[in-house]
């Protein structure tokens, strides 16, 4: 892809994301959001790199009108990482400390045995798998804390 096109796409997505966040903060209109700690059959953690913000994050996003959190996380994982199949999926009992004003509420899911086929798109530039003991330096503290919590066996039995 041409560098100027990549830059333009990233700039457009960043501006759209920041505008949405500003509107949500001002109006208090943020809705329920979902995100997932996705674990491969080999025990590696799947993280995504967005086109509009730095660092590695859990996949997820906002719910559509009338969508349950379970439906929303499956849709988001199919859109963001190309989720094909999984062994277990369930909502955790740990609160979601999502700082995104568009996505509030305790909707952190644990997905195990995840098989996926990623294709880059406007929102997600890359996915990568990481050892739970060797998460990237540029992932939020909340991701590190959720992974440590999961490793400690505090996750809801699925």
Range-by-range predicted roles:
Residues 1-35:
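Acidic, metal-coordinating catalytic segment for phosphate/diphosphate chemistry
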Residues 38-39, 47, 111, 129:
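Conserved hydrophobic "DFG−1" position in protein kinase catalytic cores
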Residues 84-93:
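A short coil-to-beta-strand element that immediately follows conserved catalytic motifs
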């Amino acid at each position: 892809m041409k560098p100027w096109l990549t830059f333009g796409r990233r700039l457009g997505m960043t501006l759209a994301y920041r505008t949405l966040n500003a509107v949500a903060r001002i109006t208090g209109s943020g809705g329920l959001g979902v995100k997932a700690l996705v674990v491969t059959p080999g025990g590696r953690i799947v993280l995504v790199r967005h086109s509009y913000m730095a660092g590695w994050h859990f996949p997820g996003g906002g719910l559509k009108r009338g969508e349950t959190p379970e439906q929303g996380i499956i849709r988001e994982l199919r859109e963001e990482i190309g989720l094909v199949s999984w062994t277990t999926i369930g909502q955790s009992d740990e609160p979601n400390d999502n700082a995104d004003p568009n996505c509030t509420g305790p909707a952190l899911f644990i997905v195990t045995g995840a098989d996926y086929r990623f294709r880059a798109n406007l929102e997600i530039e890359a996915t990568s798998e990481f050892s739970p003991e060797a998460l990237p330096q540029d992932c939020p503290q909340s991701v590190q804390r959720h992974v440590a919590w999961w490793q400690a066996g505090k996750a809801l039995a699925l």
